Design a protein with these regions (language model features):
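Metal-dependent phosphoesterases centered on the DNase I-like endonuclease/exonuclease/phosphatase
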Residues: 52-55, 130-228
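Surface-exposed cleft-lining segments at the edges of enzyme active sites
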Residues: 85-86, 114-131, 166-172
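Active-site-proximal beta-strand elements of phosphoester/diester hydrolases
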Residues: 2-10, 106-118, 150
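Structured beta-strand-rich core segments of catalytic domains in phosphoester-bond hydrolases
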Residues: 38-40, 44-117
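Short catalytic/ligand-binding loop motif for oxyanion handling, primarily in non-cytosolic enzymes
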Residues: 13, 41-43, 65-66, 118-120, ...
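N-terminal, active-site-proximal structural segment of metallo-dependent hydrolase catalytic domains
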Residues: 1-50, 61, 66-67
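Active-site beta-strand/loop signature of hydrolases that rely on acidic residues for catalysis
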Residues: 7-8, 24-42, 109, 138-159, ...
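Short amphipathic alpha-helices and their capping/turn segments at secondary-structure boundaries
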Residues: 22-25, 95-104, 133-145
């Protein structure tokens, strides 16, 4: 059985100081997709390039201490793709793809970090531009090969994907346009789609146990007032 994990690190230095390497060793994934590495190549050398006997491949942001994604793998990929060809967003370190190809099958594993629009209108518009680029990229990839997309999507698709959906309908992460993008991705249409939300396929009614992000405000984590953004 192939074991795949996805995790937002919120900084690799912080995560390792809190025991993520021991957790990786204990859970023994074949691949672990990570987001928000918040480091540069020089920071990783001789320390974070390899964790728990898994070798890492990364896409770093040009801006220091910002964004960055990676995939730690137990298996050598046949190819590594850094970025998805975006003039705007490849500078932000948001996409790494490992290809595991055999004569019988072409398979990609992707770690992606979607932009957040919560800081203001400028970043929300950037998020919309990212979504407009990323859907056709995934559809082109789907026409060529199988893939598994992991990451911090920064979108709660359905009402059951966040605690307080009524009060968040005008907030980034649950905007109608963002949710419509997810629907287009997951449902087969003339524009493509047909991607499977694996978590929802396995847990179609899960609510309180589904959350992956909690606000730092108030007692959101203590009260499990969360969102499924990953």
């Amino acid at each position: 059985m192939f074991k795949l994990t996805s995790l937002n690190l919120n900084g690799i230095r912080s995560a390792t100081s809190k025991g993520v390497e021991s957790w990786m060793a204990a859970t023994r994934p074949d691949c672990i997709c990570v987001q928000e590495v918040k480091a540069q190549a020089a920071d990783m050398a001789n320390r974070f390039e390899r964790l728990a006997d898994l070798h890492g491949h990364f896409h770093f942001a040009q801006k220091k201490g910002y964004s960055g994604v990676g995939i730690y793998t137990r298996h050598e990929p046949s190819d590594v793709v850094i970025g998805y060809g975006s003039a705007e967003f490849d500078a932000e370190g948001r996409y790494v793809e490992l290809r595991f190809d055999t004569p019988e099958r072409k398979l990609s594993i992707i770690s992606a970090y979607f932009p957040s629009g919560s800081s203001g209108e400028e970043r929300q518009q950037a998020k919309f531009r990212f979504l407009a680029e990323f859907h056709p990229h995934l559809m082109r990839l789907k026409a060529e090969r199988d893939f598994i997309l992991c990451g911090d999507i920064n979108i709660a698709h359905q009402q059951i994907d966040l605690k307080n959906w009524r009060s968040n309908q005008k907030n980034s992460g649950f905007l109608p346009e963002e949710r419509a993008w997810m629907t287009k991705l997951l449902h087969t249409t003339d524009e493509g789609g047909g991607i499977i939300d694996v978590y929802r396929q396995l847990q179609p009614t899960a609510t309180d146990t589904a959350y992956t992000w909690w606000s730092n405000r108030g007692q959101a984590y203590a009260n499990n007032v969360g969102w499924r953004l990953d």
